[in-house]
Amino acid sequence: MQLTLWTYEGPPHIGAMRVATAMSGLHYVLHAPQGDTYADLLFTMIERRDARPPVTYTTFRAQDLGRDTAELFKEAVAAAHARFRPQAMIVGASCTAELIQDDPGGLAKALDLPIPVIPLELPAYQKKENWGASETFYRLVRALAGAPAPRPAREPGRRPLCNILGPTALGFRHRDDLIEIRRLLDTLGIAVNVVAPLGATPADLGRLRDADFNVVLYPETARSAADYLKKAFGQPFTQTIPIGVGGTRRFVEEVAGLAGIDPAPVLDGSGSRLPWYSRSVDSTYLTGKRVFMFGDATHAIGIARVAAKELGFTLVGLGTYGREFAREVRAEAAAHGIEALVTDDYLDVEAAIRAAAPELVLGTQMERHVAKRLGIPCAVISAPVHVQDFPARYAPQMGFEGANVLFDTLVHPLMMGLEEHLLGMFREDPEFHDGVGPSHLGGKSFGTPADEAFEAAERAPADTPPTPAPVPILLERPAATAWSPEAEKELKKIPFFVRGKARTNTETFARERHLPLITLETLYDAKAHYGR
């Protein structure tokens, strides 16, 4: 067992909640104690949904453990059916209730309800949230899609028909991605049969078999179900994720191939501004920027390709917290000449960010906190996220409009507009000088402690009695290295968002060579050394 302040994924029953909450006419009865009942908080506060999630808890207490908790569960199932009248129910246990082994599936079956009741076996101590969402959706599809049968040929003249699989509640920009992809498919002349889980009913899952093929937007949730539909009904499914201009064009070509139609109407009129913007913006702010990427596999891989191939960034880190897709992330990292980071420990991610010294961090809510602590620009590109990443505006990550949103997301944190003449103009300004630090970091100063002490002394009233000097405490740390005036002046010519790294590297270089004074020559030697 590991104690932590942060986890990238919850237990698997949270994934089941995401699927149940996304659908209509489905109810989830969860065998859980007091304390595991926080679904309302997740979906109404963080995602800002206007309805409570369809989840009923047994909420047994400590004193209930001395009597029949199985009877409590049966009562909760019967009461939920009588009150909500769902088309279907799923039943399971939370991570805590799993320990008492009450068999929710068998207990619900014994009630002989007049609706489908699908039991979920979600091993809370081996698997996590995304696996739980995938397993829940797979079980629902397997139970409700009907008996396996070969797919009939499409009638002449009928529009191609597809299902869109993967979007869930609490998903990162799933609502807006769905709008964008439906628009793309409509432009291609492809009709959408069912979208699931988001917005689907159990009856809709019975119509999945009618489609010609499936569009998988989020493999973490939908790949298992898509594999089953391919085996049971002969429905192929897409492998390309439409993130970025290149990814979207490949997606359109793949979908057109599955549907047997011409992709030209969409490819010729894509209208994305990302390609031109990335060519027209001053390359000083784009080409070669060092970027660290971490998130779920779908977004980490897709946006890594956008950053490297469409914006000219240099990828110095790529990782995921989802071990189910570690192979794909490792393959993508190898294509960029780096080693993938596969971990669900945020401290490992923070250590990797420190070691890589990137100029931009793209990650989850936790990487936002880490980057702020380290003074590095950051943008959120993957779940888990907090309330501010469920915006009221339209902000997809997929499709051609998603590529426009990604351009803004990736470029704006890099302090656009700070051309060299502006840096020179404001370098010594008392209000806007570079020692103030970026405004988005809450006024964090990048000045040295000596500078701050000098400024504090200048602000103190003249008649203030001198404060006694504190007794020095000796710490075992490298002695500070002195800088010559010429070297300090040259250092100030470096833009402030990379100056800290240049100072650190130069001082490390000088200490390793026992140089008491950093001169102009030392600065250039250090630059050449680390450049190699």
Curated annotation (Swiss-Prot):
Specify the domain of life of the species encoding this protein.
Bacteria
Q: What's its top-level EC category?
A: oxidoreductase
UniProt remark on cofactor binding: Binds 1 [4Fe-4S] cluster per heterodimer. The cluster is bound at the heterodimer interface by residues from both subunits.
Q: Does the keyword Transferase apply?
A: no
Which is an annotated Pfam family here?
Oxidored_nitro
Give the quaternary structure.
Protochlorophyllide reductase is composed of three subunits; BchL, BchN and BchB. Forms a heterotetramer of two BchB and two BchN subunits.
Reported function:
Component of the dark-operative protochlorophyllide reductase (DPOR) that uses Mg-ATP and reduced ferredoxin to reduce ring D of protochlorophyllide (Pchlide) to form chlorophyllide a (Chlide). This reaction is light-independent. The NB-protein (BchN-BchB) is the catalytic component of the complex.
Protein name from the UniProt record = Light-independent protochlorophyllide reductase subunit B
Organism lineage reads as: Bacteria, Pseudomonadati, Pseudomonadota, Alphaproteobacteria, Hyphomicrobiales
Gene coding for it: bchB
